[in-house]
Amino acid sequence: MSYPIGAQPQGVQGYVTSNSSQWNSDVFDCCEDMGICLCGTFVPCILACKVSQDFGECCCLPCLFGSVLAVRTGIRERYHIEGSICNDWVCLSFCGQCTLCQMARELKARN
């Protein structure tokens, strides 16, 4: 025996709030902090280790392939910065040292 539907369920109205933000500096604003700029230019491996450590991960993490991409994505997620993994990959692939400097400046500004 089936019963006819007497009333349709009512939809719930909700509002989605976006707490997204932007990077504090652009990828090519390398000269904003000359210390980070020089470190990123001449010893980017050391800067990558420092960024990883400042993010709360092991300083040896950048020795693993793809880990800097994971850290950049983690920074974006932690601070609700707009972007995508694809954008992160493109930045790191074509402007790796500048992107690393941006990550270091972001962590310095937010910590």
Swiss-Prot record:
InterPro entries referenced in this protein's UniProt entry, alphabetically: PLAC_motif_containing
Which top-level group of life is the source organism from?
Eukaryota
- PANTHER family reported in the protein's UniProt record: DUF614 FAMILY PROTEIN-RELATED
> Which family does the record claim for this protein?
Belongs to the cornifelin family.
The name under which this protein is listed is Cornifelin homolog
Annotated source species: Xenopus tropicalis (Western clawed frog)
Chain's gene name? cnfn
